[in-house]
């Protein structure tokens, strides 16, 4: 379907996307067309802000719809990220997009959406439960993989 995204400064772009596309994917496309970083974007449809993890169809966005783009000042984005949530809390939207595509091959659109939402909740819960010791162990494995391999070989004998 064809969508028009109009920034408050007057610039706009037309995009061709499927009706069940993720908002995060749409933001990536808008970023490429209008050169507005994803993290500075806030998309609105009929005055309502669109959430990254939702699909366009969740908001009844149909063909030829017009979305408004509010560009958040970089200072505000950095402040929100610093106080509201850590940058590493969530994988890049591309990861969720790829997972969504895999799920779409095996489930109906509604079921795939529910599975993806549950996976995202589980991911966030797992991250929030990591202790500093867990993080230190993970960092050690990434920084010194040869030590981990040696230890694993020692245990397998």
From Swiss-Prot:
Residues 96-138 are annotated as: Required and sufficient for interaction with BAG6. The keyword Metal-binding does not apply. InterPro entries: Ubiquitin-like_dom, Ubiquitin-like_domsf, Ubiquitin_CS, Ubiquitin_dom, Ubl4_C_TUGS, UBL4A-like, Ubl_UBL4A-like. GO terms for biological process: post-translational protein targeting to endoplasmic reticulum membrane; regulation of protein stability; tail-anchored membrane protein insertion into ER membrane; ubiquitin-dependent protein catabolic process. Residues 1-76 form the Ubiquitin-like domain. As part of a cytosolic protein quality control complex, the BAG6/BAT3 complex, maintains misfolded and hydrophobic patches-containing proteins in a soluble state and participates in their proper delivery to the endoplasmic reticulum or alternatively can promote their sorting to the proteasome where they undergo degradation. The BAG6/BAT3 complex is involved in the post-translational delivery of tail-anchored/type II transmembrane proteins to the endoplasmic reticulum membrane. This is Ubiquitin-like protein 4A. It comes from Callithrix jacchus. The gene is UBL4A.
């Amino acid at each position: 379907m064809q969508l028009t995204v109009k920034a408050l400064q007057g610039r706009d772009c037309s995009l061709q996307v499927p009706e069940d596309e993720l908002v995060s994917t749409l933001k990536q496309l808008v970023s490429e067309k209008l050169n507005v970083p994803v993290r500075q974007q806030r998309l609105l449809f009929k005055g309502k802000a669109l959430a990254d993890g939702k699909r366009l169809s969740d908001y009844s966005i149909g063909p030829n719809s017009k979305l408004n783009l509010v560009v958040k000042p970089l200072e505000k984005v950095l402040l929100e990220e610093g106080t509201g949530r850590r940058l590493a809390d969530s994988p890049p939207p591309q990861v969720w997009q790829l997972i969504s595509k895999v799920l779409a091959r095996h489930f109906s659109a509604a079921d795939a959406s529910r599975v993806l939402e549950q996976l995202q909740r589980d991911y966030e819960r797992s991250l929030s439960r990591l202790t500093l010791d867990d993080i230190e162990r993970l960092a050690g494995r990434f920084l010194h993989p040869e030590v981990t391999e040696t230890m694993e070989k020692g245990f397998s004998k």
